C-alpha cells in the first residue's frame, strides 16, 4: 500500500490515563484538522494492539507515526516499528503527544505536555 507523502499515521491509546484523556483526544483531532494536518488514525483496543498497529502503519508506508498516549504506548509503538517488515525503518519519524498519566519520557526530555506545541514540533 502506498501512503501519500507527508501523511501521518496516528495511534490513539484511549487506555492511557483517564476519561479526561478521551476528551483531550477530541480536542487534538479538531486542532490537527484546523491546521490541515494530513493523517489517518487508528485506536488501540487492548494489550499488544499499539505494537501491532505501529507495525501495520510502518509496513503500509507511513514515514511519520505519532503516538497519542503515555510511556507504555510509545514503547510499544517503537517495538512495533522495529519488528515490522518496513524498509528503511531508521527513516521513520516517531512523534509523541503526551496523553498518559505519568508521561515520564516527555518530562525527561522536557517535551511540552501541551499538545499544540507537540504538534508544532512534530510538523517541523
Please identify what each model-predicted range represents.
Residues 1-68, 79, 116:
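ATP/NTP phosphate-donor binding region
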Residues 58-59, 84, 111-114:
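Short, hinge-like loop/turn segments at secondary-structure boundaries
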Residues 73-86:
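Short Gly/Thr/Asp-enriched flexible loops that form oxyanion-binding sites at enzyme active sites
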Residues 86-108, 116:
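Short, acidic/small-residue loops that bind anionic groups at enzyme active sites
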Residues 52, 76, 104-105:
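Phosphate- and divalent-cation-binding pockets in alpha/beta enzyme and binding domains
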Residues 117-124:
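Residue-level detector of conserved catalytic or cofactor/ligand-binding positions
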Residues 80, 108-109:
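Residue-level signal for well-ordered alpha-helical positions
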Residues 70-73, 99-101:
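Short glycine-rich anion-binding loops that position phosphate/pyrophosphate groups of nucleotides
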